[in-house]
Amino acid sequence: MKRKSAAIAVLISTLSVQSQVKAPVLTGAEKLNMYVSHEQMREVSAYGDLHWQYLGPVNISGRCTDVEAVGPKGKSYTIWVASASSGVWKSVNEGVTFEPVFEHKGTSTIGDLAVCPADPDVVWVGTGEANIFRSSNAGCGVWKTTDGGKTWTHMGLEETFTVSRILIHPEDPDIVYVASPGHEWTRNKERGLFKTTDGGNHWEKILYKGPESGVNDMVMDPRDPDVLYASTWQRTRLKWNDPRTYEHHKNNGIWKTVDGGKSWKQLTRGLPPSQYMGRTGIDIARSDPAVVYAFVDDYEIAYKAEEGELDSYGRPKQDVIKGATLYRSDDAGESWRQVSGLTEESKKYMSGHSGTYGWVFGQMRVDPSDADRVYTLGLYINVSTDGGATFGPIGKSIHVDQHGMWIDPDNSGYILAAHDGGISVSYDRGANWRSFIPELPLAQFYNVEYDMSEPFRVFGSVQDHHSFYTEVDLSRGRDKIRPTEWEYTLGAEGSTHQIDPRDNSTIFASLFYGKLARATVEEYPDDREWLLPENFPEEPEARGQWMAPTLLSSHNPDIVYHGLQYVLKSTDGGGTWKKISPDLTFNDPEKIGDISYQTISALDESIFNSDLLYAGTDDGRLWRTKNGGERWEEIWKDPMPVRWISRIVASQHDFGTVYVTQTGRRDDDAQVYVWRSQDFGNSWEDIASNVPTGPVNVIREDPGADSILYLGTDVGVYVSTDRGQEWQVLGDLPCTYVHDLAIHPRDNMLIVATHGRGMFVLDADPVNCENKKEDSGQTKNGDFL
């Protein structure tokens, strides 16, 4: 363990001055500077060389946004992978092994990458996922390597936050085009299409349609690199609504330049009007460049949803739009015609193409040797061999939700696909596939829970997969833990879990938007039981967060708490329920949409008194009850901002102490919000101290040392050994999203759930053994009452 206290003190002194002002962090430049501070902290941290051990799962990969390759020419393909939240990965042996090559750059979310046609060692990477997901994140501009990924240089555009496409001039590598949809949650001017002619030293914005409109796709004519087509989309994402195209949106469409972006012409003939054009993918037929395709998420209403009809998540179904529609031009974009959905059979097929979330997809490719062979990416890979008139699925054996594809221009049978399960390869035009799962450890965990079995087990939910568990085997030594295959358990892709400590078998799991179920680990799924009533009579509709908080009482595990817009309590293990709070959110009717919002996002109970509960909401409210729910008091106070409450921890060492973290991700705010109260929430102090960068997702106390706190953020893990006065980077994790963490109280192992790199464990002995002591300073009940 490193001892660098003097250097730490200097750095802390510098950063503490910066942290006194709690303004939101809204610019990419600020975020980059904050990450530089994080790396400086890592270098001087007393705990920076502790090793996080990868726990798996080796049988699950994660979402990728793009894939490109360099043809073999007598050797193996070199494959480059852009992941949604795991950085960039490279294989020099056609997928036998992959290595991360973009680990400490201030972000791990990648929107697109491009390999230079003139020099395969030159690769451009655009950070910030352009697909809008519940876990998509903002990036910090574009980067370039000239040595095959050994070193990287930041090349600007950090204010774009997202990148959807990068194109490099085939003959002049200094000419590069970068498309950005812009900020996901807020309006900004740094979006559209950018061009550099000097390798990234200077940029010019060459296509811009307003602070809500960005460029989602572009393609270059293989005959003339000055001819480009670009698609724009005016998108609005709200915390309570999926992104969509509205009737007042006038900036959606397809644009063409013939002079390298100096001037643009909108292409409209035969295409839907602007207010119906959602996300649009475009591609050119290399074999006949006059043929151009547009894959449009068409927002024209196809039919009205019936009353009581539900979507795939059990929410009220919205009116059904026309959705995935393919258009074709045979005259280089001058005129277009719809080619898909012209028969009832084709219309039915295309209606299920993208599920209910077409804005997530919007990618298509044309076979480089056949202008009539077209691939569109949705839930599955869909192929047409007749120019879009009919489609059929291929690759149904690989993971769903397709986001990227690369076809070898010299061998169109060789296809690489990027999807929510990683990367897959086909050598026969999609008839057969092989997936790189253990080779790409990219699992996107949302949560972690443990039990007290021997060996202990950990549980977690994984984006677009399910919920899983595994054993943590310490028998070979605390520093020799091996990654494992994980097994299915109760839950869904976004869940919280609670394990009954009396049997280490009964498991409770929240599921989509507030649903709750119970089972046993050994008998699942056969004994799964749904627990919650549909609605309480006086409530119009129950609202539950994507991961609604569920809590088993530490005083009596038969008592179960569950957070919707109000707190529910069961005293018989979930058999019956009563509501013990009013609606704790602002309950603004203008913010009720098709995404559950204005819900409880955090919940905790004091181990000292079962009547003391804390609850926080996604719209920034914070509450306390001292009498088991009979009366609730709002304890949000200045200087707290109105931000999503990401975690509440009632101290297990001191009765009156409670910790709260807030995340500004959905406000494009990377500020660090960490608060402590020592008087039950009557007053709050900022203990973010020298933590340089957020957002903050979780805080935990060490169960055996009352002075130690752990913090999980969007760049890694921090530890404080003095109750939050000073923080240090903990361990050798790469830059990664830490969505949850826990400390096993018996085995003293720290567990982190990362959203992009799987799950890790760390031996906590070097951190807390010298600090462990008897609990002290417990507030008496008299002070509480």
Language model features with spans:
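Bacterial Sec-dependent N-terminal signal peptides
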Residues: 1-22
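Intrinsically disordered, low-complexity regions enriched for glutamine and histidine
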Residues: 16-18, 38, 776
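Beta-propeller blade termini and top-face loops
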Residues: 21-772
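Residue-level detector of functionally pivotal "anchor" positions at catalytic/ligand-binding pockets or at interdomain
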Residues: 768-784
